[in-house]
Each structure stands twice: as structure tokens, then as C-alpha cells.
């Protein structure tokens, strides 16, 4: 709104119509390319920190009302990304109504075309809720990234730095993009392919087609 590109009323209207009205797709594309959470030190990242702190404080305050119970804040969707997404309308990051929400504290897939692994990681580290719970980092790596001692050391350094900055949980997939595409077309050809879905692993062939697509999209976009 400060840039005079769109006002709150117009944005609200496009969200309520799932960008299906006149000019809706143009607005959706603009939103999907805006400075979003996970892109580094953007205004959206700053708001994410404020929202996380407010949410954590509100959750903890509930414990004071119910002695004997401890309510712990956390930022994770676990295996409910599809189920929860079906209850959520269009969102200002360009996501269509009822599509899956993001995995845990990760930005929605496709938030930046350059991958921006460090920027994404910094953003997630900044919204850790504390109190013993987590805002997990979901990381997709191509096996080729680990070829050679130097490459392995870079990955190890990244992981060490991640936790030094405050990360509390890291889920890693090391899967070849072409292989995951082939497995999605015919899961029976890859009965032993195991993927890290979020806070748990599963045989890829055991996932529903809808959940397989979610994992494939995430791996191809970020991997």
C-alpha cells in the first residue's frame, strides 16, 4: 500500500474471490514476487518475528489461566499441510484458496527462484518460539551437492551454523529430482524410496497421490 500498487480493500477483495475476478491473476503474480518471508531481511521477515513473538506470548499466557497445564507454542504443520490448507482461503503470498499450506516454518515453495538457502534459514531461525518447542527447517538437497570432501564440509558447516543461530529441528531430504519424478509417475518402480515428509519419514509409494505431489513440488522447487 505504501508503494501505491494496491490498497487493503482491493487486496481483501481479491483474496475473497481467490484471484478469480478481473485483474486477479495479475495481482496474484505481483504478490508471489513481492518481498516475502524467507527472503532475507525483508519487511515480511520483520513482521514474521513480531507475529511469532506475539503468538508465543499469547500461548504461554493461557498456561497462567489453567494451573497444572503447560501450553507450548510451535510453528509446524507436521503432516497436516493438505488438511489445514483445505480450511484456509487465498493468502497474500499468492497462494490459491484451499491449496496446501507451507511445511512448518518454511516459506511456501517457490518463494525465491534462486533458492536462497541462507536467507531462508536465517528467517526460520529468527521465528523460533522457544519454551522447548520448535520451528523446523525443511531442507531439500540433491545428492550431487555432497560429491567431494569440500562439498560435504560445506553442508556440515551449514548445519552447524544453522543450530548456532538458534534452529531447533532440521529435516533433510537427499533425493535426485529426476528419480522423484519417475517415482511419482510409477511408485511401484521405487518401492524402497524413503523420503522425509516433515517430522517423519515414509516410503514414497505409501503416500497418497495428493501428498506425493506436495513432496515432489517441494523437492523440485527447493532442491
Language-model region placement:
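Acidic, glycine-enriched catalytic cores built around paired aspartates
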Residues: 1-223
Amino acid at each position: 500500500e505504501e508503494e501505491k500498487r494496491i490498497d487493503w480493500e482491493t487486496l481483501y477483495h481479491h483474496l475473497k474471490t481467490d484471484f478469480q475476478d478481473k485483474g486477479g491473476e495479475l495481482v496474484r503474480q505481483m504478490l508471489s514476487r513481492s518481498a516475502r518471508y524467507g527472503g532475507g531481511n525483508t519487511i515480511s521477515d520483520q513482521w514474521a518475528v513480531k507475529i511469532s513473538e506475539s503468538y508465543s506470548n499469547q500461548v504461554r499466557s493461557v498456561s497462567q489461566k489453567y494451573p497444572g497445564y503447560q501450553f507450548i507454542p510451535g510453528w509446524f504443520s507436521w503432516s497436516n499441510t493438505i488438511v489445514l490448507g483445505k480450511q484456509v482461503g487465498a493468502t497474500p503470498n499468492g497462494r490459491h484458496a484451499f491449496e496446501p499450506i507451507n511445511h512448518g516454518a518454511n516459506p511456501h515453495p517457490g518463494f525465491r527462484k534462486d533458492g536462497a538457502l541462507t536467507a531462508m534459514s536465517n528467517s526460520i531461525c529468527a521465528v523460533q518460539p522457544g519454551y522447548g518447542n520448535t520451528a523446523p527447517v525443511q531442507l531439500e538437497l540433491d545428492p550431487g551437492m555432497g560429491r567431494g570432501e569440500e562439498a560435504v564440509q560445506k553442508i556440515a558447516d551449514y548445519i552447524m551454523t544453522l543450530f548456532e543461530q538458534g534452529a531447533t529441528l532440521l529435516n533433510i531430504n537427499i533425493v535426485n529430482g529426476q528419480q522423484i519424478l519417475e517415482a511419482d509417475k510409477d511408485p511401484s518402480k521405487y518401492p524402497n524410496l524413503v523420503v522425509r515428509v516433515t517430522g517423519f519419514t515414509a516410503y514414497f509409494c505409501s503416500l497418497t497421490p495428493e501428498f506425493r505431489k506436495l513432496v515432489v513440488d517441494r523437492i523440485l522447487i527447493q532442491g
